[in-house]
């Protein structure tokens, strides 16, 4: 009886060892350190050690280092070119773009005598809302072409001051790449149009300016 129990316990112990050994072999296979792969022939030929001087490099290594330097230099040049184009576009849009003419129009309005009388010396320019949910405003500009193919730049914005509000209209013509003013006026609610200048006579022909006391008069202010 004792021998039977010993045999059974020995069998169980040996089976447990086998199971444990199987699991240990699986874990050992996962934890074994992989041998580094041997480099190929081309890798050994073109490998460029960074600690080697130029004179110590072989011809293929010199070619590899030269091509790498040229590639890095090309990336730097390309990035600098893109950055330069962005800066050029920003500068030209500020100094020669549409925003420049909006500022110029506002300065002309502030210098006009009738505009100062109607809107006061502390008049403000307010552009059109770019989005219903945004508070930022910008001058509304558009480019149009007439039947002769000539380009025109049209701008609009609001002028406020002395509890009055006016709608400013301006138009410029493209003359060999340079924009020239055609007309600039502001339409004031319950007052009429204040014409700053009209080189085309298109606005003045339709304009009937009301005097200060409501009488119909053709009065020129600040011209």
Swiss-Prot record:
A single GO BP: protein import into mitochondrial matrix
Subcellular location: Mitochondrion inner membrane
Topological region Mitochondrial intermembrane: 96-223
Gene3D superfamilies assigned to the protein according to its UniProt record, in alphabetical order: Mitochondrial import inner membrane translocase subunit Tim21
TM regions (residue ranges): 75-95
Transit peptide: 1-23
Residue numbers on the Mitochondrial matrix membrane side: 24-74
GO cellular component: mitochondrion; TIM23 mitochondrial import inner membrane translocase complex
Disulphide bridges, residue numbers: none
UniProt topology in membrane: Single-pass membrane protein
Principal location listed in the UniProt entry: mitochondrion
Domain of life according to the entry: Eukaryota
Keyword set, alphabetical order: Membrane, Mitochondrion, Mitochondrion inner membrane, Protein transport, Transit peptide, Translocation, Transmembrane, Transmembrane helix, Transport
Keyword Mitochondrion: yes
InterPro entries according to UniProt: Tim21, Tim21_IMS_sf
Subunit note: Component of the TIM23 complex, at least composed of tim23, tim17, tim50 and tim21.
Assigned protein family: Belongs to the TIM21 family.
Function: Essential component of the TIM23 complex, a complex that mediates the translocation of transit peptide-containing proteins across the mitochondrial inner membrane. Required to keep the TOM and the TIM23 complexes in close contact. At some point, it is released from the TOM23 complex to allow protein translocation into the mitochondrial matrix.
Protein name: Mitochondrial import inner membrane translocase subunit tim21
Organism: Schizosaccharomyces pombe (strain 972 / ATCC 24843) (Fission yeast)
Name of the coding gene: tim21
């Amino acid at each position: 009886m004792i021998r039977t129990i010993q045999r059974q316990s020995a069998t169980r112990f040996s089976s447990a060892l086998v199971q444990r050994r199987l699991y240990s072999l699986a874990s050992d296979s996962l934890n074994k350190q992989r041998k580094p792969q041997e480099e190929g022939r081309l890798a050994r030929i073109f490998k460029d050690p960074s600690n080697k001087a130029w004179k110590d490099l072989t011809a293929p290594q010199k070619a590899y280092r030269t091509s790498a330097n040229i590639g890095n230099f090309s990336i730097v040049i390309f990035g600098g070119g893109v950055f330069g184009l962005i800066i050029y576009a920003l500068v030209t849009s500020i100094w020669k773009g549409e925003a420049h003419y909006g500022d110029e129009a506002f300065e002309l309005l502030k210098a006009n005598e009738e505009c100062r009388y109607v809107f006061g010396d502390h008049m403000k320019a307010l552009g059109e809302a770019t989005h219903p949910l945004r508070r930022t405003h910008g001058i509304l500009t558009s480019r149009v072409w007439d039947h002769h193919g000539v380009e025109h730049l049209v701008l609009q914005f609001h002028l406020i001051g002395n509890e009055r509000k006016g709608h400013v209209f301006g138009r410029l013509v493209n003359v060999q790449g340079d924009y020239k003013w055609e007309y600039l006026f502001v339409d004031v609610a319950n007052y009429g149009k204040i014409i700053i200048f009209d080189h085309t006579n298109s606005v003045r022909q339709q304009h009937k300016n009301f005097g200060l006391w409501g009488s119909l008069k053709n009065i020129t202010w600040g011209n």
